[in-house]
A protein has these predicted regions:
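N-terminal auxiliary segments of SAM/dcSAM-dependent transferases
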Residues: 1-76
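Conserved SAM-binding loop of SAM-dependent methyltransferases across substrates and taxa
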Residues: 123-134
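A short SAM/SAH-binding and catalytic strip from SAM-dependent methyltransferases
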Residues: 180-194
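A short glycine-rich, Lys/Arg-flanked "PGG" loop and its adjoining helix->strand segment in the class I
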Residues: 195-210
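Short, glycine-/aromatic-enriched active-site segment of Class I SAM-dependent methyltransferases
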Residues: 215-236
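Short alpha-helix
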Residues: 237-253
Length: 311
């Protein structure tokens, strides 16, 4: 059974010591509460797993066991990325992450034998989708201890050592290990130096590999630098134009750069649920004009950009 302190064996020079340093109460005051939730999960034997739009594990169990599973997993609230289903328990997450995957899966194609890095991976949902597409292994990193622990709760049912979620920040990674596919989904606009983030994405991509960047964008020609909050988020430094995203990817070294999707985010895709009870997108939009945020900026639109590393 995979546990919190399991680490990949093929990441030389990575700061893997940080895993044990961060999986402790002194690093995050809620750690023991979250860990006890995972440890309280019944030792139910999961059946076959399906890595589709909903990540599923067949879990034959009685109603009492199912209720215990639900109570334990709800102690790991909020659940952002998904959906997941364990037996008859459906985890309706804030994001319909399957919609985002659908927008890029044709461009990604067959990932057979590829190693994938997912920066800002959350609980690892996209890692399961990459495995479905044939990936050999997925390494996800996310600074949120809660999201990492959610992943290990999921692993209690899936128990698949090909998908990792580690509590490491992107800027802490050396360039000594490179990947066939690097993903950065929903990270760029939180970076004070967006070009530097894309340069790191490039450095972590193998020659012949691809980088995929998903970010908030504006459809205007000029990038947006919010003053104060954007859609209630206080750490959005730049919402680039699509042209700016392409230019940054090219400056970082990627070629054959293209925008493969541009889609406005709607409250059908991002919303409050039983598993994410905080406010969500609908509370961030102008009540009288949903094409604007409550601060008066253009409402969220997201683009997916892909480029190749040829040298």
């Amino acid at each position: 059974m995979i546990d919190l302190y399991d680490i990949p064996k093929n990441l030389p020079d990575w700061p893997l010591h940080l895993i044990k340093e961060r999986f402790r109460q002194s690093y995050h005051g809620d750690f023991e509460r979250w860990r006890s939730a995972v440890e309280s999960l019944p030792k139910a034997v999961a059946g076959p797993c399906i890595y589709g739009d909903t990540i599923r594990a067949e879990m034959p169990c009685d109603e009492k066991t199912l209720n215990a599973v639900k109570l334990a997993l709800q102690r790991l609230h909020p659940w952002r990325k998904g959906p997941f289903c364990f037996g008859d328990l459906h985890i309706d997450t804030e994001w319909r992450s399957d919609w985002k995957w659908r927008r890029m899966q044709h461009a990604l194609g067959d990932l057979s034998g590829q190693r994938v890095l997912d920066i800002g991976c959350g609980n690892g949902y996209f890692g399961w989708r990459a495995l479905q597409a044939g990936a050999y292994e997925v390494v996800g990193i996310d600074p949120s201890i809660l999201f990492c622990i959610q992943h290990y709760a999921i692993q209690r049912f899936l128990n698949d050592g090909r998908n990792w979620v580690l509590p490491i920040k992107g800027e802490e990674l050396p360039g000594s290990v490179q990947f066939d596919l690097t993903l950065s989904m929903g990270v760029l606009y939180h970076r004070r130096e967006p070009l530097q983030h894309i340069q790191q994405l490039f450095a972590l991509t193998k020659v012949g590999g691809r980088g995929v960047l998903e970010t908030l964008v504006v459809t205007d020609a000029k990038s947006l630098y919010p003053s104060g909050r954007y859609a209630r988020m206080g750490n959005v430094w730049c919402v680039p134009s699509t042209a700016q995203v392409v230019q940054w990817m090219q400056q970082a070294g990627f070629d054959q750069v293209e925008i493969i999707d541009v889609t406005a985010t709607t409250p059908d895709e991002q919303r409050s649920t039983e598993w994410m009870r905080f406010g969500s997108l609908s509370g961030c939009l102008d009540a009288h004009d949903p094409s604007r945020t409550i601060e008066g900026y253009p409402a969220p639109v997201r683009a997916i950009c892909m480029g190749f590393r040829s040298s």
